[in-house]
Amino acid sequence: MDKTLLESTVHKVLDELRNRPIPLGVSNRHIHLCAADYARLFPEQAIREKKALLQPGQYAAEQTITLAGPKSQLKKVRLLGPLRNVSQVEISRTDARTLGIAAPLRMSGDLQGTPGIRLISPFAELELASGVIVAQRHIHMSPLDALIFRVAHGDTVSVAIEGSERRLIFDNVAIRVSPDMRLEMHIDTDEANAAGADDPHTFASLVARR
């Protein structure tokens, strides 16, 4: 194969990879707990896996928690595993209004200055001092994915939600790159409803880097 043909073939393959559908994950309200908070809420109980998630090693647990805010409660909020270093609650804007909490838009782990909430399990209650956020929409990528899409960790991009009757373009989609991540875009339930993402044929596609 001559050099020109080889380069043409490589560019064609890369273009196909860049234009391939990005799996779309809809994140319902959920909670991450540190070991100490988990032990208080579920004493002498091992965390039990209910369903594996697409991201390697992550799963929805059998355990659920009630979130108690100033205005209302949300019951049966799913715990995600494994346990983390810091407890964190991720909700939608609609959930925040229901609870009466001014949860800021943040990336996971960016918890400084965030409000707290009361956590209630079947065994105990715990006042979480901070950690309630509305998660910024984002795309998980491996380093190879990032190389193919020509983006880097911390970049923001515009993404089209395709495949439903309510095609929508989201700006300010954060890129998160790690060797243990698989390609997947995460949006919350408010964003999913706006884009008609309950359609099983829905997927994400990169529109532009911002």
UniProtKB/Swiss-Prot annotation:
The keyword Isomerase does not apply. The keyword Lyase does not apply. It comes from the Bacteria. GO terms for molecular function: acyltransferase activity, transferring groups other than amino-acyl groups; metal ion binding. It catalyses: propanoyl-CoA + phosphate = propanoyl phosphate + CoA. GO terms for cellular component: bacterial microcompartment. It is found in: Bacterial microcompartment. Phosphate binds at R84. Its EC number is 2.3.1.222. Zn(2+) 1 binds at H30, H32, E90. GO terms for biological process: propanediol catabolic process. InterPro entries: PTAC. Pathway: Polyol metabolism; 1,2-propanediol degradation. There are 2 Zn(2+) ions per monomer; Zn(2+) and CoA bind inbetween the 2 domains in each monomer. Its cofactor is Zn(2+). CoA binds at V26, S27, N28, K71, R78, N193. Keywords: Acyltransferase, Bacterial microcompartment, Metal-binding, Transferase, Zinc. Zn(2+) 2 binds at H138, H140, H186. Belongs to the PduL family. Formed by 2 beta-barrels, each is capped on both ends by short alpha-helices. NCBIfam families: PRK15070.1. Involved in 1,2-propanediol (1,2-PD) utilization within the bacterial microcompartment (BMC) dedicated to 1,2-PD degradation by catalyzing the conversion of propanoyl-CoA to propanoyl-phosphate. This is Phosphate propanoyltransferase. The gene is pduL.
